A protein has these predicted regions:
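N-terminal nucleophile
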Residues: 1-416
Length: 416
């Protein structure tokens, strides 16, 4: 977990990030938290554009720091019209730099995704159903286990098939992905699933389809890196923000999707606060509540509605109109609460945000990261947010400016 945020108004955008990095140690589950991670980068020394990283700290085993600073050295002098063009340039760089991230490392990343998915799915099914009411015969039990796995992946495939392709992927990539999966997945499956030397064809078919979709289509694996591109292209007079999630690389293409809910176009009327990773405290500040409160309220109203309906039925009242009214009432309650919070919290914060100076923008961004860190400090959870906070301001006039920046060395000893 981490706490990162962008605060944007017509003048500039402020980026703030903590330094915490959480590592879990293999089978032991030991959790180590380090407070020295770099998450904000200057993408060009000549133009007003920055990049922020969250979740995984590497691209197919290559640290983002190496990839980003190599891009800046080779392409930082190139100016682009929009932030989207900077994003495309960076992705092209990732696709072409096999001397930094080799084909072997890219394929190893895909195999890691396969292995984690298989292990997670099998462990989950094992706890729920695999060892319930199995026959005594080993062969019969194995057949039932394989059938249940095949049914599970068939259901997952129905869902994944409806998902959109990763950006830049299409049906032609499915053919190549299927061939790659056939050549690489089988041994991984044999290492994880119980078997007698092979897997039945119907299970193989579902696994092939599953991993083909994982390579080509948007999915919910947590093995991604979030990249946030922020700043100004040469044709943009107001800050633009584009957030993507990168899952790996296949067939000379980066597997990524755009997170539209965490993007902001270049617009003078578009002042926003966008949190990443640890979001609850920011939402509470902006909206007056976080999502868990609304979910709890919705569940509570639904439960009370069901109890009222049950009481009516027990008294011999079976009125479909009453049931529809209760459902409508629940939606109306949620809508009124959200409208109240929007009018009394969100709009006030947004209106205030529009008039903030660069200095106040940076202070606000830093304070919101501090708020998340403090909440974890006084809770019984791991302090997965913390350490020094880096803060940068990007404006059209002044470019990328560091407000606060941690250094791993003594600046007085390194004047060169």
């Amino acid at each position: 977990m981490t706490a990162e945020i962008i605060v944007k108004n017509p003048v500039a955008c402020a980026l703030a990030a903590d330094s915490a990095m959480t590592m879990t140690g293999g089978n032991s589950g030991t959790v180590k938290i380090f407070n020295n991670a770099e998450k904000i980068y200057q993408l060009s020394k000549h133009y007003p554009v920055g990049l922020m990283v969250y979740n995984n700290a590497d691209f197919c085993g290559t640290p983002w720091e190496l990839s980003i600073r190599s891009f800046r050295k080779l392409h930082g002098h190139e100016e682009h019209s929009t932030i989207r063009d900077y994003l495309n340039s960076f992705l092209s760089f990732l696709n072409s730099t096999y001397n930094i991230t080799s084909i072997a490392k890219r394929e190893a990343k895909l195999k890691e995704i396969f292995r984690r998915y298989l292990k997670l799915n099998y462990d989950d099914l094992s706890q729920k159903t695999l060892h319930v009411a199995l026959p005594e015969s080993d062969e019969e039990a194995l057949n039932i286990i394989h059938q249940r796995l095949a049914n599970f992946y068939a259901s997952e495939n129905e869902f994944l098939e409806r998902n959109p392709f990763f950006e830049g992927f299409d049906e032609s990539d499915v053919i190549n992905a299927r061939e790659f999966v056939i050549n690489n997945y089988l041994q991984i499956a044999l290492d994880i699933f119980p078997n007698n030397g092979d897997l039945p064809e119907h299970l193989k078919t579902q696994l092939i389809n599953f991993f083909t979709f994982i390579i080509c289509k948007e999915n919910v694996t947590s093995l991604y890196s979030g990249l946030v591109f922020a700043g100004f292209g040469s044709d943009e007079y107001y800050a633009s923000i584009i957030t993507i999630q990168i899952y790996g690389s296949f067939n000379n293409k980066v597997m990524y999707k755009i997170i539209h809910g965490k993007c902001s176009k270049s617009d003078p009327d578009n002042s926003v606060i966008i949190p990443f990773a640890s979001e609850d405290e920011v939402f509470t500040f902006v909206r007056g509540f976080n999502n868990s409160i609304i979910n709890f309220m919705g569940n509570t109203v639904s439960k009370l509605s069901n109890e009222i309906l049950e009481n009516l039925r027990e008294r011999g009242v079976n009125d479909e109109i009453s049931e529809q009214k209760l459902i409508s009432l629940k939606d109306d309650i949620i809508d009124r609460v959200q409208r109240y919070c929007d009018e009394n919290f969100t709009q006030k914060v947004t209106n205030m945000l529009t008039s903030l100076s660069k200095k106040d923008l940076s202070y606000m961004a830093e304070s919101l990261v501090n708020l998340s860190a403090f909440k974890l400090k006084i809770s019984d959870s791991y302090e997965t947010v913390g350490g020094p906070i880096d803060v940068a301001i990007i404006s059209k006039t002044d470019g990328f400016v560091w407000i606060k920046r941690k250094l791993y060395f003594d600046k007085n000893l390194n004047n060169n």
